[in-house]
Amino acid sequence: MKPTVVSADVLFEDHRATLKWEWVAGLGASERRFDEVAVSEARSGADLVGYLNYIHPYRVQILGEREVAYLSHVGPEDSARRISRIITLEPPVLVVADGQTAPDTLLSMCERAQLPMFATPESAAFVIDVLRAYLSRHFAERTSMHGVFMDILGMGVMITGESGLGKSELGLELISRGHGLVADDAIDLFRINQTAIEGRCPDLLQNLLEVRGIGLLDIKAIFGETAVRRKMRLKMIVHLVRRETLERDYERIPYEPLTQDVLGVPVRKVIIQVEAGRNIAVLVEAAVRNAILQLRGINTYQEFVERHRRAMEQDD
């Protein structure tokens, strides 16, 4: 599920420093929000901000140099008609960018209609980039999953499995081997675009890892700044299972790579059996290295199948 609400005052305050903007009209409409239907139907935050567009009134409408010229470099009646059309469509916010001065007619109509309008010296393209990234994060589909989320060799890896299999201990060993912790226990996952899932740690659990028998460990304080990450893209799920579960539910060597659906995005999945004497940390590292090879187009299993086929043909 994704949130469907962000108000004009929150949008303004969150970017006051970055965009150096001022609230020039419609200050009484600080609670004005995006149309909830438009938000729920938007494929990403990119659909919710753009240059002046009469066809998509639900967007944050950005007025750069050309848009301001379109509104002002005509006769008074035409200018008033064009501006009135914008006001009638009731966009959530208007932003005058490129250091442009808003026409007096636009200011007065926004004030009369209580339509929030911001003015910034930053370029229109920069404003659009910043707001698209912000709205993509804010309105992203989201969920929470149980496990340990790690940065292993630059790849975001989520370790899952039933309780008592040693996920946190595995995470601790991987940290001691130079990898980074993103989140332990609860992982907040966001679909930031159609093909990417981003994982973060809830603020309450930031930098913390719980190990049975020891308690809570502050990984940043113990191992240093480089041992923690603020967020990572989810690229792989390592699922820990007991031996009987592995033999019952999974093939030993699957012909097709396993995947797990997370917020509508298929994520590569690897099953690792937990058993006394097995070095799970090394196995996880090997699985990640193998996945990196596959991303480069090197598939060891397919190469083995091809080698086996050629050997059989030679025997015949």
From Swiss-Prot:
SUPFAM superfamilies: HprK N-terminal domain-like, PEP carboxykinase-like. Its EC number is 2.7.11.-, 2.7.4.-. One of its GO terms (biological process) is regulation of carbohydrate metabolic process. Mg(2+) binds at S168, E210. Its cofactor is Mg(2+). PANTHER family: HPR KINASE_PHOSPHORYLASE, PROTEIN YJDM-RELATED. HAMAP family: HPr_kinase. This is HPr kinase/phosphorylase. It comes from Polaromonas naphthalenivorans (strain CJ2).
